[in-house]
Design a protein with these regions (language model features):
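Bacterial Sec-dependent N-terminal signal peptides
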Residues: 1-27
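A non-transmembrane, solvent-exposed segment enriched in polar/low-complexity residues
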Residues: 22-164, 168, 177
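Terminal low-complexity, poorly structured segments
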Residues: 1, 7-11, 118-121, 199, ...
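Exposed alpha-helical structural elements
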Residues: 4, 112, 136, 140-143, ...
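Extended amphipathic alpha-helical segments with heptad-repeat/coiled-coil character used for oligomerization
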Residues: 166-234
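Generic surface-pattern signal
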Residues: 10, 14, 146-153, 157, ...
Length: 235
């Protein structure tokens, strides 16, 4: 009898653990849907992909379990954007199929963070900046990063997300900085350009070597050119 009671208690515990599993419920509302195309969600930490079918009326939903809060890349037709999903937070996403990357509205517990991530105010160095002189480029990068951090702070989001996002913003903002030695000779019409000590010092300051950061797609994109730039130092 005691054994049966123990079995029931163990089973009860297993069931309560099972029912308490955190699941993020995502609901999609798509205008002008393309039924042949699914929403693809790529989890940046694991690389795992989830697909969500969108029906003729533009509706789709999915419940996702077994993940920690993290950045996720969403793709639909040709558009893509960065999301932040949390297993404790439901999210409703509404967009036009042709305009998802530019304009998605969010509702639910995860709305504030994801609305911020789509902010038009976030800016980064770009190809046109490659013609700038070094000092001007460093100043512009620093100014953009400071402005991006202000946008983040103004959003008043949870502290743990804000701390992570400041790191992600660094690689987002300075993505082209690591490519400067590659592109400046052409765009700056300066074939004799050799990166200065100040350039390498700045590059070193914004390039932590940390395997834990490989969960950020921005870091993975930034790192190879930074390593390449360091390997050419003194050549």
């Amino acid at each position: 009898k005691m054994r049966t009671l123990k079995s029931i208690m163990v089973l009860g515990l297993a069931l309560s653990t099972f029912t308490a599993t955190e699941a993020a419920k995502l609901t999609f509302k798509v205008t002008n849907p393309n039924e042949k195309v699914k929403v693809i969600l790529t989890f940046n930490q694991s690389g795992e992909q989830k697909e969500v079918a969108i029906d003729a009326a533009g509706n789709g939903n999915i419940e996702i379990t077994g993940f920690t809060p993290q950045y996720v890349t969403m793709q639909y037709t040709r558009g893509r954007r960065t999301l932040y999903l949390d297993p404790n937070q439901d999210l409703t996403l509404s967009f036009d199929s042709d305009n998802m990357w530019r304009n998605t509205t969010f509702e639910g517990a995860g709305a504030a963070i994801n609305t911020y991530l789509g902010s038009k105010e976030l800016q980064s160095l770009g190809m046109p900046d490659m013609k700038m002189q070094e000092a001007a480029l460093i100043h512009r990068g620093d100014s953009l990063y400071a402005a991006n951090c202000q946008v983040l702070e103004a959003a008043k989001l949870p502290a743990d997300f804000t701390a992570q996002e400041k790191i992600r913003l660094q690689f987002y903002t300075y993505y082209y900085f690591s490519k400067y030695a590659l592109y400046h000779p052409h765009f700056g019409k300066d074939d004799n350009y050799i990166p200065s000590k100040a350039y390498y010092e700045k590059l070193e300051a914004i390039t932590p070597i940390n395997a834990g950061l490989l969960a950020l797609k921005e870091y993975k994109a930034f790192l190879p050119d930074a390593i390449s730039a360091f390997s050419n130092k003194g050549k």
